């Protein structure tokens, strides 16, 4: 499958052949894409939620009042779960939310996400992702030429430092090397910009 190579000025400068097994899968598996996104989001959760149990709450262990004769329901501790300021029963604990997902499924998710963007016409190949200076305003003007609301930019094995610094303060714009290409960011951004180097490395990686 052939597609245009664009410059950062959004002008056609050539043509490139894309591997159809990676960028033009015939049937897009939305279920696989969702599986991978759920796996990514679960893994990203901090899992540091926690409440204190009866044994962890600070306070006296003294019986609040005698067993009989007060007319109140019997109580053995002020730290019990039914008491104000007491412990929490069955509350959240610190844990990892990460789940396991086979590498083959992760790889398929990436292939189908790239194919979906390509089918929408929102995967663009750029000849070079390099800037002379790390100027945010200059990069904003460049991205405005593509008329998109959000951009996921994938470079080769290394990202140009000027391009990376210029993009840091731009809303809804993420710049990563090819190893950082992931399904969640591909789907949540409107446009995916790939350098020529990124195309060749991704094709080698996902073959």
From Swiss-Prot:
Keyword Iron-sulfur: no
Keywords associated with the record: Ribonucleoprotein, Ribosomal protein, RNA-binding, rRNA-binding
GO annotation terms (biological process): translation
One Gene Ontology MF term: structural constituent of ribosome
Chaperone recorded as keyword: no
Pfam families: Ribosomal_L4 (PF00573)
Any one GO cellular component localisation term in the record: ribonucleoprotein complex
Matching InterPro entries: Ribosomal_uL4 (IPR002136), Ribosomal_uL4-like (IPR013005), Ribosomal_uL4_dom_sf (IPR023574)
Identification of the protein by name: Large ribosomal subunit protein uL4
Similarity remark: Belongs to the universal ribosomal protein uL4 family.
HAMAP family for the chain: Ribosomal_uL4_B
Gene3D superfamilies: 3.40.1370.10
Function: One of the primary rRNA binding proteins, this protein initially binds near the 5'-end of the 23S rRNA. It is important during the early stages of 50S assembly. It makes multiple contacts with different domains of the 23S rRNA in the assembled 50S subunit and ribosome.
């Amino acid at each position: 499958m052939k597609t245009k190579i664009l410059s950062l000025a959004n002008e056609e400068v050539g043509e490139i052949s894309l591997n159809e097994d990676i960028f033009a899968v015939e049937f897009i598996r939305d279920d696989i894409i969702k599986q991978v996104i759920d796996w990514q989001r679960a893994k990203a959760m901090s899992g540091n939620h926690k409440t204190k149990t009866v044994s962890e709450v600070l306070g006296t262990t003294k019986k609040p009042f005698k067993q009989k004769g007060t007319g109140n329901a019997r109580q053995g501790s002020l730290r019990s779960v039914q008491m104000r300021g007491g412990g929490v029963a069955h509350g959240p604990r610190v844990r990892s939310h990460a789940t396991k997902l086979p590498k083959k499924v992760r790889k398929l998710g990436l292939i189908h996400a790239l194919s979906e963007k390509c089918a929408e016409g929102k995967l663009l190949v750029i000849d070079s992702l390099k800037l002379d200076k790390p100027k945010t305003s200059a990069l904003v003007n460049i991205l405005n030429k593509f008329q998109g609301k959000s951009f996921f930019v994938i470079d080769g094995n290394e990202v140009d430092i000027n391009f990376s610094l210029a993009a840091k303060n731009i809303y809804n714009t993420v710049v990563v090397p090819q190893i950082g290409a992931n399904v969640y960011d591909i789907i949540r951004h409107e446009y995916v910009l790939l350098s020529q180097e990124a195309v060749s490395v991704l094709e080698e990686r996902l073959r």
